[in-house]
């Protein structure tokens, strides 16, 4: 991160990177709020209940905030994990299959969120088996673990990738 080995980085520096895995990494017996509060504590981020509730509205989760995760659909669980994007101050997002399980409206919201983050100077590495229409994206298609094609509006150097 920022020209330093990840093992030599401070927690503060590691917080510049937010990783959203493809699997559900939520505690099933806890509520949406409880799961997000645990994560916020891990990254040492303070946020008011009002602000947290407001962020949950983006992905239409506010009405379910006190539901245990086990009672949510796959798509709702995915949106809980993706809500971390709204709560994080990270400058780099690594997203693994972020749109899997999402409905069309949620995909559009996530696409807007990604585009706004990129336009504000954030960097995103997104892996997907589906070709989503995200504007202003550099796309590298891999086949058998090798670069097959590169589609970009403006190609940057390999070291910048």
Task: Set out the residue ranges of the language-model regions.
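Helix N-cap at the start of a conserved alpha-helix in ABC-type nucleotide-binding domains
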Residues: 104-106
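Q-loop/switch helix immediately C-terminal to the Walker
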Residues: 23, 28-44
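ABC ATPase NBD Q-loop/coupling interface
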Residues: 1-12
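Catalytic Walker B motif of ABC-type/P-loop ATPase nucleotide-binding domains
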Residues: 93-97, 102
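Conserved ABC ATPase signature
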Residues: 68-77
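Hydrophobic anchor residue at the start of the ABC signature
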Residues: 82, 121
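Conserved ABC ATPase "signature" region
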Residues: 37, 49-64
């Amino acid at each position: 991160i920022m020209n330093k080995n990840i093992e030599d980085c401070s927690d503060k520096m590691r917080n510049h990177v937010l990783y959203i895995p493809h699997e559900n990494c939520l505690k099933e017996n806890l509520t949406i709020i409880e799961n997000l509060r645990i994560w916020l504590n891990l990254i040492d981020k303070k946020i008011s209940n009002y602000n947290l509730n407001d962020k949950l509205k983006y992905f239409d989760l506010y009405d379910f905030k006190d539901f245990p995760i086990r009672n949510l659909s796959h798509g709702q669980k995915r949106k809980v994990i993706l809500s971390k994007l709204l709560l994080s101050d990270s400058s780099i997002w690594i997203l693994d299959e972020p749109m899997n399980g999402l409905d069309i409206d949620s995909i559009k919201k996530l696409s807007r969120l990604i585009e706004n983050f990129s336009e504000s100077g954030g960097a995103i590495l997104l892996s997907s088996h589906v070709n989503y229409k995200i504007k202003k994206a550099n796309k590298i298609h891999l086949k058998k673990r090798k670069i097959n094609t590169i589609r970009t509006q403006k190609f940057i150097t390999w070291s910048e990738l």
